[in-house]
UniProtKB/Swiss-Prot annotation:
Annotated signal sequence range: none
Function: Catalyzes the methylthiolation of an aspartic acid residue of ribosomal protein uS12.
EC number per UniProt: 2.8.4.4
Name by which UniProt lists this protein: Ribosomal protein uS12 methylthiotransferase RimO
Domain Radical SAM core: 134-372
Cofactors required: [4Fe-4S] cluster
Record's cofactor remark: Binds 2 [4Fe-4S] clusters. One cluster is coordinated with 3 cysteines and an exchangeable S-adenosyl-L-methionine.
Disulfide bonds: none
Length: 440
């Protein structure tokens, strides 16, 4: 019997890239390849890269170099794959380079290096209907579209992943159903722009379980909300149509959680970023959302040190944060990106030391807000999904916490717990980012 061909896989970048990796791995497994966790056991290594900012590109190039040094046979795919000349300039020995979403080309490149076994592999029959997943069994990412129709001046995603292409809602719901049947208890909806879902299809009617459903965020959320699992929305653009899903959150159909990357608050900076400059309306909208759904958790990300940002702009942002009282916030110092429109706008660069100072002040400011908001949860009861268990106890997340990016809930329980368990707890303590609780 011939040796089963083996593939090593390195997946970098955001959850969208994770889903791409899962799709490639599933196809390779269906064709009889064995996925191995070490360089030395792999016949070929695939590196799924990130090319969003320069530091991500550097990390991708380092990962490619490590794979070449440890194995020698390397195929590169993902967002940085659109910059093949740069990759080959640094690593001329890579065997093939493909861009994001080019699943077939990646698999074909693997075929060229190590052909699939012509003998039937009985393990192929064990590939689960939901495919190979890189996340724990109890949660999974559900990608509803590719690409983005915006042209934010700091971003090159449209040039890497193209314009918005929405998946038909029936396909998305079928995948979600397979995940739920496989035991997934939390579905994280992701895309480049979740609130624009279906725009490119003109919200076309599709069919799900024999019923017509519009390819639109509201209808998607309504149907996902019937599946009996946590549904969490990520990468939501602050459009007015976001208002439509808040009642679903208030009714407990989907999690009261919105991930909205506001990026800044100063109208001048937002205009330079080519983002919606309606900060006053945004504050009013946040207030309205919380009136409808008091439990709503809002996560966001911001950029400080964008070219042209003044101290006045930055102070405006801090004041806006005080007013907005966001729950979960991340912040990045602006990083120049080759090919991003911001690099050609002739705006005054912000010196690195000022970027660092503003980042430090931003984080301290938001940390105080986060600590105060979490302190309000002490004494309250929450449902917690357990992610991991060690000798010190269990660690989980509430509806207010997305995996890997938000805080955690440290759970004290007299009964043994397992990852994927959902338990009711009472919060006993809080710090700036995390909670401590006991099972009730």
């Amino acid at each position: 019997m011939s040796k089963t061909p083996t593939v090593g896989f390195v997946s970098l970048g955001c959850p969208k890239a994770t889903v791409d990796s899962e799709r490639i791995l599933t196809q390779l497994r269906m064709e009889g390849y064995q996925i191995v966790p070490s360089y030395e056991d792999a016949d070929v290594v695939v590196v799924n890269t990130c090319g969003f900012i320069d530091s991500a590109k550097a990390e991708s190039l380092d990962a490619i170099g490590e794979a070449i040094a440890e194995n020698g046979k390397v195929i590169v795919t993902g967002c940085m794959g659109v910059d093949e000349n740069n990759i080959r300039g640094v690593h001329p020995s890579v065997l093939a380079v493909t861009g994001p979403q080019q699943y077939e080309q990646v698999v074909n490149a693997v075929h060229e290096v190590v052909p699939p076994s012509i003998e039937h592999d009985p393990f192929v029959d064990l590939v689960p209907p939901q495919g190979i997943k890189l996340t724990p069994r109890h949660y999974a990412y559900l990608k509803i579209s590719e690409g983005c129709n915006h042209s934010c001046s700091f971003c090159i995603i449209p040039s890497m992943r193209g314009k918005l292409v929405s998946r038909p809602v029936g396909d998305v719901l079928s995948e979600a159903e397979r995940l739920v049947k496989a035991g997934v208890k939390e579905v994280l909806v992701i895309s480049q722009d979740t609130s624009a879902y279906g725009v490119d299809l003109k919200y076309k009617l599709d069919f799900w379980n024999g019923q017509p459903v519009k390819t639109r965020m509201l209808e998607l959320c309504e149907e996902l909300g019937k599946m009996g699992v946590w549904v969490r929305l990520h990468y939501v653009y602050p459009y007015p149509n976001v208002d439509d899903v808040i009642p679903l959150m208030a009714a407990g159909k989907i999690l009261p959680y919105l991930d909205i990357p506001f990026q800044h608050a100063s109208p001048k900076v937002l205009k330079a970023m080519k983002r919606p400059a309606f900060e006053d309306k945004t504050l009013a909208r946040i207030k309205k959302w919380r009136e409808i759904c008091p439990e709503l958790t809002i996560r966001s990300t911001f950029i400080v040190g964008f070219p042209g940002e003044t101290e006045e702009d930055f102070q405006y942002l801090l004041d806006w944060l005080t007013e907005a009282q966001l729950d979960r916030v991340g912040c990045f110092q602006y990083s120049p990106v080759d090919g991003a429109p911001a690099e050609a706008m002739n705006l005054e660069p912000v010196p690195d030391e000022i970027k660092q100072d503003r980042w430090d002040r931003f984080m301290a400011h938001q940390q105080a807000i986060s600590a105060a908001r979490l302190q309000l949860k002490v004494g309250k009861e929450l449902d917690v999904l357990i992610d991991e268990v060690d000798e010190d106890g269990a660690i989980g997340r509430s509806w207010a916490d997305a995996p890997e990016i938000d805080g955690m809930v440290y759970v004290d329980s007299e009964q043994p717990l397992q990852p994927g368990d959902k338990v009711r707890v009472r919060v006993t303590n809080a710090d700036e980012y995390d909670l401590w609780a006991e099972v009730i």
